[in-house]
Amino acid sequence: MISTSSILILVFLLACFMATSAQWGYGGYGRGYGGYGGYGRGMYGGYGRGMYGGYGRGMYGGWGK
């Protein structure tokens, strides 16, 4: 059975791919759906305001509040 962490990694990679291929079409899968956006406001957004955003204002953001 696939672990939850593996699913999150796959979703994140998919979001990054979508953000690269159709960045401004769907807002990088972030502002369009806001679920797991690569550059949007998704829960696990890479650069967005997600809860676990790397550079965003998420609860555990790297440089955010």
UniProtKB/Swiss-Prot annotation:
Q: Which residues carry this modification: Tyrosine amide?
A: 29, 39, 47, 55
List the GO cellular component terms.
Answer: extracellular region
Per the record, the GO terms for biological process are:
IRE1-mediated unfolded protein response; neuropeptide signaling pathway
Q: Where in the cell is it found?
A: Secreted
Is Translocase among this UniProt entry's keywords? no
For the keyword Kinase, the answer is no
Report keywords, A-Z. Answer: Amidation, Cleavage on pair of basic residues, Neuropeptide, Repeat, Secreted, Signal
Transmembrane segments annotated in the record for this chain: none
Q: Where is it mainly found?
A: secreted
**Leader sequence residues:** 1-22
Query: Coiled-coil segments, which residues?
Result: none
Residues recorded with modification Tryptophan amide: 63
Give the UniProt family note: Belongs to the YARP (YGGW-amide related peptide) family.
Instruction: Describe the task this protein carries out.
Output: May have antimicrobial activity.
Output this protein's name. Neuropeptide-like protein 28
Gene transcribed to yield this protein:
nlp-28
